[in-house]
Amino acid sequence: MDAKVSGLISLSCFLWFLILSIPTGMLMNRIGRKKTVVVSFAITALAMLIPVLKYDFAFVLVAFAMLGIGNTMLQVALNPLVTNVVSAEKLTGTITLGQFIKAMSSFLGPILAAMFAGSVWGWKAIFPVYAAVTVLAMAWLAVSPIQEQLIEKSEITFARTFSLLRDKYIVLFFIGILVLVGVDVGMGVTFPKLLQERCSLPLEKAGMGNSVYFLARTVGAFLGGVVLMRFSASKFFTASSCLALVSLVGLIFSRNLTMILFFVALFGLGYANLFSIIFSLSMQKMPQKTNEVSALLIVGVSGGAVLPPLLGVITDTFGTQGSALITLAIVWVYMVALIPFVRNVRPSGNEN
């Protein structure tokens, strides 16, 4: 499989966020949040079993599609379900700890694959392991008593969901999600190339930039989850977004491996909790419409497919990864510009 096909398959996952987010919101209103999450787990588990039963290109594509569907449904339904389990004061911290678990899974994936490489099934043994973990999570949730609030009985539609953008805070946070996901994907593309360009590292070693980045995000999500249980989300957002911007500027001027990895790690720490904060504040602002808010914000995740091609054009035009970093820094200024709005947002539309 050539690089173009591989890239298209990877980017296709963002298509599911665009297509299925709002229909998942509709499903939540019909069968409830908990059942929607259980369905997402079931689809994910089936997707993990397909490569075990038959491993060829066509079946892997089917598995990848099912994985994208399950992931989209989970992303839309899980955070609103959390609002039925924890208080508003602990919502941001709880969502952030969830991001920590997600980051840990991403970080451990390659390590587990390497561990299983010497087994009978080889690295593909990771699929039944992931399927088993998913089934356990599904069973645990299925038997857990959760009292869901019937806060919105009217039917969710595409028009009703997009009408939330009439609220200035929701539209600002929606754009914030676009920026966060776009920059995250852009970073993943840019870091290895930056290390190749400035440190003359071979491609296989240049991937350490992403490893450092994901490790920093994992640590940052854990620390953020603990801190956000006790301290103001708006102050944490201010510090994190400014730290990330300083890190991007530092990367632009860094020329040696140590400094590049330092600023990559610093950016990961700054980035780690911003998605959770925006998501939490959006749901707290419209607590009667959390299903629609969640669906709309997850539509914004599809924006991750927009920025990387633009970075490619800019890099080809100027012939340096520094131009991509400058572009990312300029885009990131939006997150800093959100600071006063994050400070002023009030639940239930009572903003200043």
Predicted regions span which residues?
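Conserved MFS/SLC helix-loop-helix module at the cytosolic interface between two early adjacent transmembrane helices
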Residues: I19-A58
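Extracytoplasmic gate region of multi-pass secondary transporters
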Residues: D167-S211, T218-A221
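Helix-loop-helix hairpin linking two adjacent transmembrane segments in secondary transporters
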Residues: L97-I146
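Helix-breaking motifs and short loop linkers at transmembrane-helix boundaries and internal kinks
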Residues: G32, L53-A58, S232, S254-R255, ...
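Structural signature of the two symmetry-related core transmembrane helices
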Residues: K35-L49, K235-G250
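Central cavity-lining transmembrane alpha-helices of secondary-active solute carriers
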Residues: L11-G25, S211-L223
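Cytoplasmic helix-loop-helix junction between adjacent transmembrane helices
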Residues: A63-F100
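Glycine-rich segments within core transmembrane alpha-helices of 12-TM secondary carriers
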Residues: T92-I111, I298-P308
